[in-house]
């Protein structure tokens, strides 16, 4: 055979493969999601092996470890006691609440670490939805946004670097941007959950926060979030959401979930000039961890390949529960 073009020439040795490698992973690509609670001990999440609800002291140690591994941003999610949950989720803008308190402590102890927060009502709602639910089961868009603005401002006052609206209410990015700017927080960024799909991959996360929709004898509660989260069948809709969020002032656009939506990551990366983030969500994490615990797969190889696929699809940032493990593996390689 006399073939002039032989792609295998560039695969011949590890050195050559490294020379022509198109995408690379680094610890600074990762945003590390952390669950926190008011208890004075860490508590493993049964549906997410190796992941915990952290107490404040444990949180400081874990964030310090992440910084030392090269991770430069964490995102905080609260497990709120049922006694504090209400229909309007008002605890979300309590200046002395769990999230503002955690932000202030982290900024004192590890000031260099960037902190992202979550803006949505579901952890704080007795109904388990991201917005206010009326008697007919409708999720109230504009009324919810008024609460979200208060939540975002509370987080910014505590020292958050990035606000992460995950609620999927129409117009919330612009409303939050205007609220932040009007209070002097023009330097606080917005990482918008731009294409957040109504996905079955969120199950373990909702277990971690006890944030799934709940039955209520006094009114209708939808058992899913499909009236505000996106239909998994749609891709063009993601471009509409992207254009809106970018116009309204989002700094970074996110796709959630990640693995099953790499086409959306790619489309947004070519459609928008904003950095794209992908969320390697709880269901994806738990599937890998469960299979690895049974020795059905090589956890390290699967995780690094999965994370690399996000970069290859066009993501600049990856939210992943594997962040510390992956960072350590990259150091050891």
Region locations from a protein language model:
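Alpha/beta enzyme core
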Residues: 2, 13, 25-31, 37-333
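N-terminal amphipathic/basic leader segments beginning at the initiator methionine
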Residues: 1-21
